[in-house]
């Protein structure tokens, strides 16, 4: 039985837990789970959300728990596309909770309230995503943040917690990782004020780094094979062939030097292996074409 904190939350920590597996083994286990979801047209996102809410120690009758459940239901109704889908949200939410658990094992535990805010943002960060010929920075993230904010307001979430959720969703903008990694640099032109404020708040910056890593973990931190599956999904969604140039751009311009959070850094060896992976001699060129 875990100790219960105030506000109906229970601590989630690594005390007495089994040792962490090797990062490669953990990555393969997570990829196997996600592969099973893909084969079975899963998961049941509301059911997964209920389990994750209980895992992090949030009482089911709290506003944050309500927000997580309602966000999952909204994403399930939307369903999404080949890559930006309900399953992607399930993976990112699971990744976020795994990264938080890994960090807790290394003495960087998050309080249940922050885990709940993180979970809510993960569950809705790409809702209503749609392709565009010319993407405007933060436009899609602002749309998702507004959707989550409306859900949170209806559930009675406090203003400061809603502000945090909005900022975390904005921080998943693909090119934002460099801004999170160097918060001392001036905010780039066009950055929303709430995100600029996040970079000055260590607590929120920590959550944003974790969510950004969770958003990329399935594509860059589990296994080369699962990275390829992610590329196939994206190729179908964009109806574009993705080759070595796109691969280099993803790792250089989006992922950057490495993961940002303590939990993400645990998977650094996996990232290095995936970044260096190339097709073996005699295998087809690593070009992913839309189905």
Which residues does each PLM region occupy?
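Short alpha-helical scaffolding segments that buttress acidic/His motifs in well-ordered protein cores
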Residues: 67-72, 118-124, 165-173, 210-214
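Surface-exposed cleft-lining segments at the edges of enzyme active sites
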Residues: 57-59, 130-133
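Acidic/histidine metal-binding catalytic segments
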Residues: 106-117, 155-173
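Short alpha-helical hairpin
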Residues: 46, 51-75
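Active-site metal-coordination segments of metallo-dependent hydrolases
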Residues: 79-91, 131-146
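Divalent metal-dependent phosphate-bond-processing catalytic cores, especially two-metal-ion Mg2+/Mn2+ enzymes
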Residues: 2-53, 83-90, 95-114, 124, ...
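Short helix-to-loop capping/linker segments positioned immediately adjacent to catalytic or ligand/cofactor-binding
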Residues: 132-135, 152-159
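An active-site-proximal "capping" alpha-helix that borders the catalytic cofactor pocket
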Residues: 92-99, 139-155
């Amino acid at each position: 039985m875990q100790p219960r904190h105030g506000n109906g939350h229970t601590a989630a920590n690594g005390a007495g837990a089994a040792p962490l597996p090797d990062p490669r083994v953990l990555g393969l286990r997570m990829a196997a789970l996600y592969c099973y979801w893909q084969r079975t047209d899963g998961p049941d996102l509301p059911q997964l959300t209920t389990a994750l809410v209980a895992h992090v120690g949030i009482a089911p009758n709290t506003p944050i728990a309500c927000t997580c459940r309602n966000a999952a239901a909204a994403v399930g109704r939307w369903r999404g596309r080949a890559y930006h889908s309900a399953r992607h949200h399930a993976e990112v939410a699971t990744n976020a909770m795994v990264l938080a658990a890994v960090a807790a094992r290394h003495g960087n535990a998050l309080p249940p309230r922050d885990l709940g805010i993180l979970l809510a943002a993960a569950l809705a960060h790409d809702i209503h995503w749609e392709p565009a010929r010319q993407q405007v920075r933060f436009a899609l993230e602002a749309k998702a943040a507004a959707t989550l904010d409306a859900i949170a307001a209806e559930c009675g979430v406090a203003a400061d917690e809603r502000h945090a959720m909005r900022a975390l969703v904005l921080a998943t903008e693909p090119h934002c990782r460099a801004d999170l990694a160097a918060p001392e640099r001036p905010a780039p032109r066009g950055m929303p004020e709430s995100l600029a404020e996040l970079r000055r708040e260590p607590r929120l910056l920590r959550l944003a780094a974790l969510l950004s890593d969770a958003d990329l973990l399935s594509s860059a931190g589990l296994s080369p094979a699962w990275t390829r599956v992610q590329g196939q999904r994206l190729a179908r969604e964009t109806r574009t062939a993705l080759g070595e140039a796109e691969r280099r751009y993803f790792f250089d311009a989006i992922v950057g030097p490495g993961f940002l959070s303590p939990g993400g850094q645990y998977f650094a060896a996996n990232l290095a292996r995936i970044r260096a992976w190339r097709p073996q001699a005699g295998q087809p060129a690593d070009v992913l074409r839309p189905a």
